[in-house]
């Protein structure tokens, strides 16, 4: 079990999801929000602001995920808790992006602000959640079939320790424990 590699997979997936979400959102802005004033010039869709966003925003998302602890304890995660953390971080991050980056954009009506916020949140959250769910499911499967395990020591001896060992190892699905020994107590 290589924790650094597994953490890198999450970081890479989060980076890709942030890039994909920003790209799709940028296209949405250029084709559905701004054409009323600026028109649509396909050659100028991916301009300097887009490139700057592709550099800064994914790194910002990675920092936010790091600060909220989404890269800690990657093997012992509940997918539900991870989903809740992703929702909370996405709401905070999208709100930050909205107020500090998007609020000065041209909109034809104030209802467009609601659309912009909702579309950015939906794109970012859904793409990130799908990537994370896939990684977490693969990880849980590896834990359940015993490919990934956690070194475990049973404290006790004789029949009682053997009984505990047999109860844990006889389960159809592995709990992730890889027993490395017993500590004998008198």
Task: Please provide the spans of the model-predicted regions.
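Acidic, Ser/Thr-rich low-complexity segments on the non-lumenal side of membrane proteins
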Residues: 154-186
């Amino acid at each position: 079990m290589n924790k650094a590699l597994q953490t890198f997979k999450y970081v890479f997936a989060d980076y890709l999801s942030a890039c994909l979400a920003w790209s799709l959102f940028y296209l949405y802005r250029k084709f559905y929000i701004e054409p009323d004033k600026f028109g649509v010039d396909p050659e100028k869709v991916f301009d300097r602001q887009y490139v700057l966003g592709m550099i800064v925003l994914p790194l910002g998302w990675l920092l936010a995920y790091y600060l909220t602890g989404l890269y800690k304890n990657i093997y012992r995660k509940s997918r539900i808790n991870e989903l809740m953390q992703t929702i909370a971080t996405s709401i905070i991050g999208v709100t930050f992006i909205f107020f500090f980056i998007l609020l000065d954009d041209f909109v034809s009506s104030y209802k467009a602000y609601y659309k912009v916020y909702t579309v950015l949140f939906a794109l970012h959250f859904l793409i990130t959640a799908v990537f994370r769910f896939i990684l977490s499911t693969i990880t849980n499967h590896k834990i359940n079939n015993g490919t990934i395990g956690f070194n475990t020591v049973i404290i006790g001896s004789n029949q009682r320790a053997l009984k505990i060992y047999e109860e844990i190892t006889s389960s159809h699905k592995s709990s992730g424990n890889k027993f490395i020994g017993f500590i004998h107590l008198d």
